[in-house]
Amino acid sequence: MSTAEQKTETKNPAERSTADVTLDYPIARSGQKITKLTLRKPKAGTLHGLSLTALMQMQADEVMVLLPRIVEPTLLEKEVRDLEPSDMLQCAMEVATFLAPKAVLGYPIESKA
């Protein structure tokens, strides 16, 4: 494992701007297989029209609306709905981690003063 990979793995989850999800069940698209998704930490505008409570509770319907907005490669709505439950859960867990305050994740809040 390279030093860069080690730094990425040990980085405070509250400070990550992306998260990689390796799919248990790859997505077939045009003769190719998508085996990994990269989720971007959503900004407030990306969450427009969504319930933060539902996202933190990892409610599938709410997560399915958010995923196409934050995932690379971009997924179609049908592809998101066809995700296997284990893959959906991995994505939902990353979303919840993105939204959780640092204090909830057990990391101290650094003072800027």
How does the language model describe each region?
Residues 2-113:
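Short, surface-exposed, charged amphipathic helix/loop patches that serve as local interaction elements
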